[in-house]
Amino acid sequence: MKYQKIKNVEKPLSKIIFGCAIPVMIQGEDADELLDEVYAQGITTFDTAENYGLSETSLGHWLKNRGNREKVVIISKGCHPYDGRDRVTPENLKHDIEQSFERLGTDYIDIYLMHRDDLKVEPGSMVEILNEYHKAGKIGAFGGSNWTHQRIAEANQYAGEHGLIPFTVSSPNFGLCDQIGDPWGGGPGCVTISGPSNAEARAWYRDNQIPVLAYSSLGRGMFAGLVKSNDMEGAKKILDPNAVKGYCYPENFERLARAEQLAKEKDCTVPQIALAWILNQDFEVFPLVSAKKASRIASNAKALDIVLAKEEVEWLDLRRDRR
């Protein structure tokens, strides 16, 4: 495993982050054995959220039983809408942070993210609350998940004008598998920086040196190794409806075909190529990966050792016809 420090977080993050939105944890079941195995792979950073069912409770159970809170980095999120009701308000933010403390069994969260945005809300009000918790030592870095780079810039302008800590981290969708449709929809919805239409966003992250925590890094399973590039109809049977809505488009099957070809040439797997593509970007990015078995995480982590040439990165993403 490789590790990297980011601003306002005392401990280094593992370059691959384990996503805790998996059935066993969402249902609040005992995931200690799985988390032990993931941790043994060197993964020390775990992503969860207030609205991931009982995921925080399951993670907190493991932290308590193993006594390793000081050795791991916790990412959690709040202010997700419920029943079509936007919840990006100071009151909901405070409620969700406090509830996460209780569920996780901790008095601080290393990285806290606004899970969704509400364009009707001035971001400065969120910046004020997050700074209160940061000043009290209850959260480290903070930022947005599914916030556009323009909205983050707006929040950071407010922070600069008022002498406050700005957003220093962001968690949009990012991966070789372009999120062409919104998997969940509703409101401002999901934000992606993948694909040809989001080159400006990626340049902004590079220029502003804000690290990206990339969710759905394998396209909700489309680039996880089971889907084949020559079988779109079969993919629709393998993937969940949200993944089909977000990722099952001809462009992504062409990307998958190229990933299959390169994986064969480099004697590795499709998910390893897809993760290596993320890790070989020209900006700071940490892919989030989930799995029901730690062996898959161990396999995926080998992507850290794969070096891709710039021409290969561009070819995989359909930005050039030849390598």
Report residues per predicted region.
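N-terminal binding-site loop/beta-alpha segment at the start of enzyme catalytic domains
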Residues: 1-73, 135
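Short, well-ordered coil/turn segments that N-cap beta-strands
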Residues: 11-16, 42-45, 68-72, 106-110, ...
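Conserved beta-strand positions
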Residues: 18, 48, 76, 111-114, ...
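Active-site mouth loops of central-metabolism enzymes
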Residues: 19-29, 78-92, 120
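Short, acidic/polar
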Residues: 26-38, 88-104, 153-157
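A short, structured active-site edge motif that brings together acidic residues
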Residues: 70-83, 170-174
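Active-site groove signature of glycoside hydrolases
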Residues: 101-122
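Beta/alpha (TIM)-barrel catalytic core signal, keyed to glycine-rich beta->alpha loops juxtaposed to Asp/Glu
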Residues: 121-323
